[in-house]
Amino acid sequence: PKKNKIKKEDLKNLKIIDVLKKVLSHPNVCSKEWIWQQYDHTVMGDTIQKPGGDSGVVRVHGTDKAVAASVDSSAVYCWAHPLTGGKQVVCESFRNLISVGAKPVAITNCLNFGSPENEENMGEFVECVQGIGEAAEYLKFPVVSGNVSFYNQTKDEGIKPTPSIGGVGLIKDYNKMITMDFKEIDNIVLVIGKTEGHIDQS
């Protein structure tokens, strides 16, 4: 992908508060609450993990079990590197499910790409599918269904390669479900693993 080059003179009058506001208001960063609040997630009283976290959770009637669901997409990662982006979106779905205490069971996908008649678009598609397959096999997270949508473009320009993954997981006892909110003052936040090198497509 093309990279925007920043010149030193462009930074002279830059104010950090303006940069922060711009970043926090970007659709990829800002709150998505206005979207999911439009649906009444309390219908039938089955929702036990409200929207806003990494996965939604609904109870299974007559049991202590619950089903967790997550939908993830990775256009920016796939645009930068389709193989890695395909792996990343499967891993994100997996992480979002285990973050609420669910055992990931299976995924479905919706693969959105430009025209397959364009060699670059077709190459992105092939690599992305390969990445999804490799990650799913490694994680034992089977792809049970899927859909491909080609020719998503304006004139001759295709959209960024956009795989969307819907994942489901099982929680055997929803009383042990994990929620994202802090439980008390001075809770500790831990970062596991190395974090360097992720800013480019974050």
Protein language model regions, located:
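Glycine/proline-enriched, intrinsically flexible loops and inter-domain linkers
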Residues: 1-202
